[in-house]
Swiss-Prot record:
The lineage of its organism: Eukaryota, Metazoa, Ecdysozoa, Arthropoda, Hexapoda. This is L-asparaginase-like protein GL17509. GO terms for cellular component: lysosome. It comes from Drosophila persimilis (Fruit fly). The keyword Ribonucleoprotein does not apply. Keywords: Disulfide bond, Signal. The keyword DNA-binding does not apply. GO terms for molecular function: N4-(beta-N-acetylglucosaminyl)-L-asparaginase activity. Residues 1-20 form the signal peptide. It comes from the Eukaryota.
Length: 457
């Protein structure tokens, strides 16, 4: 009877979900292929930088993942959002977050919501080395960074404004508000809560991930002695509500590693990732005896059961170097793998096709979610701004898709045409007094003080 109870418990832990082609086949890596460096998305230059450090010898895993993050935060080779200061929050603030975990003892250091300090991964490393804490946030994190010798940097607002102004002129779409008034899908605020009786059934909002426009990257290093480190770096979701902390800084959400079993990197919609801690779940699935392929698939299905709108990917690596991945909501999820065989470095970009998530969601929640609207100019004739919204309804297992087209008024189109002129006006004012600026005086923002932090990097 005792044996049966244990078997039943184990079966519950390892119960596979419905079969689907969510993951790439597991790649068994011979010991001679180690060390191993894996990074999310197709940023080969950053992976190469990390790999150069890792192959210098054993016990270089920590320095390797840090070097990968440093390359991304100091260059534009990991996309505009990470290196180009193009992911402001809704108030125009630029902040970074980063995290580092040691698989030997689960030591963890992270920062979030930190403005004015470029070297976010370096500050996260200092949190791990010099404090008993795991996560520091906001202005206090910046003060800690300065105390550790990191310098604040001033950055021009030009790049930020290039992203922020079109968003403001487009009625702040998309944003992260719900159940507020005025309606969040047609306004910039200021918002206040809707009375409970007026709140509608929750609509899931999808946030597509554009190729090359990723706001988070993760690195995982495994050496020949079995040491694991993982690190993550993020500029945060564009137009997020100020004060929001993302998955890159939360233990188990974006990264996790344990020398005894393996590690994982997760990326995608951070607010969903933080609710499920997929990197931690994947590592615990390895501990329970699952393969990297089945672990990645099971975790991805768990997310999709509750969040049909999820976009993102997950890479899982065993302590022996076997790796696999799963993804949802993307045309393709790519990650870079570097290793060594017979003294020669080998690097490849893995790309997996994601299953249509509507085929996966058979027992999950029902309801509606909307693809973020895209604004395009009609070709030929008079310029008319067209807003196309794809509405997908899941009811009783039957999918239906509706397309709605809304032709905006001419005055909205005229505002868009004048955008460049307004932007020049803003920049000229910034050149004269690069401190606080109230954009609403120019008619470019909602009727509340719009404040740019003075310190940018």
């Amino acid at each position: 009877m005792r044996y049966l109870c244990r078997a039943q418990l184990l079966s519950l832990l390892l119960l596979p979900l419905l079969k689907a082609r969510l993951s790439v086949p597991a790649h068994p890596i011979p010991q001679s292929f180690l060390p191993l460096m894996i990074s999310t998305w197709n940023y080969t230059d950053a992976n190469r930088e990390a790999w150069t450090v890792l192959r210098q010898g054993p016990r270089r895993t920590r320095q390797a993942v840090i070097q990968g993050c440093l390359h991304c935060q100091n260059s534009n080779s990991c996309g505009r959002l990470l290196g180009g200061h193009s992911a402001p929050d809704s108030s125009g603030g630029i902040t970074l977050e980063a995290a580092l975990i040691d698989g030997a003892n689960m030591d963890y250091g992270a920062v979030a919501g930190m403005a004015g300090i470029r070297n976010a991964i370096g500050v996260a490393h200092d949190v791990l080395r010099y404090t008993n804490h795991s996560l520091l946030v906001g202005e206090a994190a910046a003060r800690f960074a300065e105390a550790m010798g990191h310098k604040k940097e001033v950055h021009s607002l030009s790049t930020t404004l290039d992203v922020l102004l079109p968003w403001l002129l487009g009625k702040c779409q998309p944003n992260f508000w719900r159940n507020v008034r005025p309606l969040a899908n047609d306004s910039c605020g200021t918002f206040s809560p809707l009375p409970q009786e007026q709140q509608q059934r929750e609509m899931r909002q999808e946030y597509p991930i554009e190729p090359g426009h990723h706001d988070q990257v993760g690195f995982l290093a495994l050496d020949t002695e079995g040491h694991l480190h993982a690190a993550s770096l993020s500029s945060g979701a564009r137009f997020r509500i100020p004060g929001r902390v993302g998955d890159a800084a939360v233990p188990g959400a974006g990264i996790y590693a344990d020398n005894q079993v393996g590690g994982a990197l997760a990326t995608g919609d951070g607010d969903v990732l933080m609710r499920f801690l997929p990197a931690l779940l994947a590592v615990e699935a390895l501990r329970a005896g699952q393969s990297p392929a089945s672990a990645a698939e099971a975790v991805m299905r768990r997310l999709l059961r509750h969040h049909t709108e999820f976009n993102g990917g997950l890479v899982v690596v065993s302590r022996l170097g076997v790796y696999s991945a799963a993804c949802a909501g993307l045309d393709e999820f790519q990650f870079v793998v570097s290793g060594e065989s017979s003294g020669r470095s080998m690097r490849r970009v893995e790309g997996i096709k994601c299953l249509d998530r509507h085929e996966v969601v058979t027992g999950g929640p029902r309801g509606n979610f909307y693809v973020v609207s895209k604004k395009i100019w009609a070709a030929g004739g008079e310029d008319v701004l067209v807003q196309r919204v794809e509405k997908i309804t899941l009811n009783e297992g039957v999918d239906s898709r509706e397309f709605e087209e809304e032709y905006l008024e001419d005055k909205d189109a005229e505002i868009d045409v004048d955008e460049g002129e307004k932007a020049e006006e803003v920049r000229s004012l910034l050149d004269e007094s690069p401190g606080d600026l109230l954009l609403h005086q120019l008619g470019l923002a909602p009727p509340f003080p719009f404040r740019f932090p003075f310190i940018y990097f």
